[in-house]
């Protein structure tokens, strides 16, 4: 066994604020500034879509973060949207600094991230025209993320609901990790139910679970499903 030091950054960005173009720099600076005191830990983790610029729009910022994390001996794991060659989007997590790799979400939320029977339903009902609702799935098999020497089995948002998906993600992972944006649930029981799903995956797989959220239950859970640290 070995110890891994982890810092989870929770931005608490309101959903109505998060995707407004004029707030992109403000949100990025919030996460960057919150991380300044955390460099030097093995893992620094930002949640799902922490950066609201598309990946190709954030090249300079990502290069700067990569340099900062590497200088500190840290791996920075963060969520960022990416464009697909088809014109759609991909919900992506990347590793900067002391690590490498990317993960693209494999199981999308119906009507939230994609519209079933899109040719018939898109435009028919206004609700189906949500921002970022034209996502493209990632490959069924993807290389593991490597962060500070750890093989990560990653799931994004509601992917953690599915035991088979988490189990099949990476063979013999060192750690499980899930990132999410739970502002969609508002003040309901949703964030807590989502968190309990993550705890179950830790227990089932006998691996510690790292969970970072924009607004929800951010936590470290050990291999027995026992909560070791939690926000809020």
Descriptions of predicted regions:
Residues 1-232:
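Enzyme catalytic cores with a strong preference for nitrogen-chemistry domains
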